[in-house]
A protein has these predicted regions:
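N-terminal helix-turn-helix DNA-binding core of bacterial DNA-binding proteins
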Residues: 2-42, 61-63
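Beta-hairpin "wing" of winged helix-turn-helix
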Residues: 51-61
Length: 63
């Protein structure tokens, strides 16, 4: 993870909005998607870029 990946991740307004939303606490991809007019695939794409840049991390809950 370098500066290039971080700046790329932060260059998109939707990704900045996702980060702002996540400041409130942990959320699932579905919960994040409920706040935006985007498909689940688009939310996943943005989250992948944010994860690659080290700006968010993923945890999985056992059911």
């Amino acid at each position: 993870m370098g500066f290039g990946e971080t700046f790329k991740a932060l260059s998109d307004p939707a990704r900045r909005d996702i980060l702002s939303l996540l400041r409130e606490g942990r959320m699932s991809a579905g919960e994040i998607g409920a706040h935006f007019d985007m498909t689940g695939a688009t939310i996943s794409y943005h989250l992948k870029i944010l994860k690659k840049a080290g700006l968010v991390f993923e945890t999985r809950d056992k059911h």
